């Protein structure tokens, strides 16, 4: 899932790519979604990067759901492998909220007097954000709205047909072949990618990122919380047994 470890990892990868003067950075993505704050941090990093970022949803069977859809839209080049999907970009609270179009949800009718003001604000904000990314990158604005409002999803082939992504590639060498000669817009300039004969260097997560990923894993966090709660109960029940 997208979270603080993802931000740390991508920031380090972008700095490394800039230091090496790499012609591009391929961000391989497979995510069910994640935290809104972390997603926005990542998008800011991508949009201000001096190195072109090509997000590649891969391998086959991977997905760029929810927050992953926003990251894909924000990338200089959006690409997917066959058999992958994206979408379902409706924001939900950590506790869970009914998605638009489901029974009991008033997200479809934002003027409903019984609707949640906070829910309307969250959905409107998310829609405007994804719409702005679509306009910036010249991608399908109408579908971006539907992905937020109605949690719509697309396969890789459908996304290519609807101008949601730029490329469908079977693997990284195929992706590089299709990228060669492609013109992209960076912050202050336009750049033509020259990807023929490039050597691929994989950037692995460092120990700091791996530790953060372990600690912030929901299952691990829940276990640590239980250990803390039971530790407090035991200490209150038998004070001084473990700690004088």
Which residue stretches match the model-derived regions?
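Soluble extramembrane regions of membrane proteins in the secretory/endomembrane system
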Residues: 1-213
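Core alpha-helical transmembrane segments of integral membrane proteins
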Residues: 215-244
